[in-house]
């Protein structure tokens, strides 16, 4: 079986993930909730993860890395926080509902213009079509890194380069 929806529900957790979750459940408190040993230990684990993620992403400041409970909430926060009334946003037909629903709501409620780049018969993003849509004056390009429907991977470095060249932000669903 080929299973492409790991972002939603990983079919089988690797043993190292199971071990880490069990260890955390048995020893850590709630980060930022107090001065108990468990709470302080949890805070150290979270901050260590934040520093590792910042290094992985090339982020100069770890305190600029924010965690969310899940990808849907993170995408909703990013999209709703960045897109303003009347803005123009470019996305793709490959996107998941965690991108499409907030964008459609913003279009209906805030007058945001949402334009979608298509894909070819094999489900690959039409980069030439995307390039035609990404023009100066857009607020953001919102794109998935890999489709959980087709399994195709999007060249997000190229998409980010297009977005930044047009003066736009780039939001990537990398879940």
Mark where each language-model region is.
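Pyridoxal 5′-phosphate
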Residues: 1-175
